[in-house]
Amino acid sequence: MHSVLQKNVERKMSSTEKKETNILLALLAYEIFDQAMNIDASTVDWSAVLAEAQCHKVTALMYPAIRSMDGVPEAVFNKVCGTAIAVATASEAMLKEQRRILDLLEAHQIPCAVLKGTSVAYLYPHPELRTIGDIDILVDEENLDEACKALQADGFAPSYTAEKHLCLQKGAVWVEMHRMVSVFPESEKGRFTKQTMADALHHIQTAEIDSVRFPMLSGAYQIIALLAHMEQHLATSGIGLRQVCDWVVTVDALRDCFDGETLALLERCGLLQFAKIMTRLCEKYLGLPPCSWTADASDALVDAMLSDVLEGGNFQAQYAKRPLADVLTDAYDVAGKGKTSLFRNYIRYLKKYLRQNEPWAKSRLWLPVFGVFLPVRWGVRVLLGKRKQINLVHAVGTAREREKLLREMKLYQ
């Protein structure tokens, strides 16, 4: 498989070697690690750099580097500066709203922890420049209903329900109230990770941004939560540079936590290979000081992962590039078959879809019903112009190629 993967890497390397991509990575490394830059601003295709940064939602993180450079076109500086101001303003508002929600939960004596979001943003040199998303809060399963009722009494309305969380909305604020950190596959190591993370709320620390405090997971639990979040998205459409930046600041801040005990735990969870590849990527391309435990990470896999990240972009940009990825890709190979099977992948997707969206349909008899209904509904939406037409041959080829890379991560294996 390594030989096939190497061919894929070689075919994709042009995207990783593009001058504009390397410049974007250098700008991010300057912000995160104050790494020296050697960039002649007059030779840069700034429109390409900005387009790439916007795709990954990291434009605001370019601001400190752009501000320090000579020769950057005024229009480019103004674009980056304007984005930085907008992101910082939104971050401040979200931070205050998050604190207000945490106060509501505290008033109801509901233990909780912030996932992602500010729990990684506070580690950035300039936390306000990290583009915000939803507010993700973890509570125990038995407290989920009460937590959601508290938010509904405050004006939030239920939006949708997923297997791991309930989403509520009030205006422009979206809150994902998690009953679990992530959804784990039904493998031995997947079940072990689920059991381990069920105890996460007993491992809490307090962090702060601009004197605004919030609870978050500590040590190995924060590490596993971030890895699980990344692999969930990687296993379908992919992750972008924003998620890689979150990982690099976390690894650097928790460097001392990656001791023998934590590495052994990651191995038991089936996440050590993934952690090694992502960390080595950060060392190679974002200026992370070397970690001794990544020495045996494959450079071919690291380069392939960067190519995958760059091609994917942030979550909002991925569907057009990787349509039906959730249906066509099986990253875990829980069945241990080794070979990919579109039929098996589709059955796996149907089970997941029914579990998350139609919990009442518990009988296996519903599988063939929805197996026909979902494609028909999708076809009707395409005809009505509500969905873009998809080249299924290309989608299948892309999914199979990515699946080879994902299997090399040995997720939960």
Predicted region positions:
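Conserved NTP-donor binding/palm subdomain of two-metal-ion nucleotidyltransferases/polymerases, i.e.
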Residues: H2-G133, V139-Q413
